[in-house]
Amino acid sequence: MKKITVILILLPLCIFGQEKKTVTKNFRTIVGAGIAGGQTGISPVFDLSGGITYSRYFTGIGIGFDSYQFDAFPIFADWRVGFGKKQLLFAYATPGYVIPERHNNEGAPSRVDRMQGGFFLDAGMGYRIPVNFMHRISFTAGYRHKSLSHQITYNTMCGAVPCVEIPPTIYVNHYKYGLITTKLSWELGR
């Protein structure tokens, strides 16, 4: 019994542990500019996001500007994951909601235009080029989806006496754009 007790007491002295790497959380800001191309041409796009990196993952929130067909401001969550030892290659996804710019009434005063936002997604692959320990330049290529709806209401004026109320004529157009994007981004942070 004494031998077993001595062995159990001395056994921890022979065990070697591996040193665990410490993974820190860091803040990162990403500013991107590029073009989005679709069936009716190309337009500039801009994105700004900030968030936290942990290991090979980045999670943040952002806002952007998309001028394809209708000017709009996407608000999105930004998720990225790096591949490889240096994490130069990465995949990204930015789901969110797109807020259209206010649309001015066009034509007669009896016409009312109203834009409504919808689903937004930008996803693809990218490659980082380290400039120094705090700065990186990245190139991305991906797919961008933007959904909007445009409601046009025509109010018919009364032109004769006695006036008979005529219900307004309402047209609703739903737009869903699938675009190919390419962006150049600057990443600041570890």
Annotate the PLM regions.
Residues 30, 45-47, 76-78, 122-124, ...:
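Membrane-embedded beta-strand positions in outer-membrane beta-barrel channels/transporters
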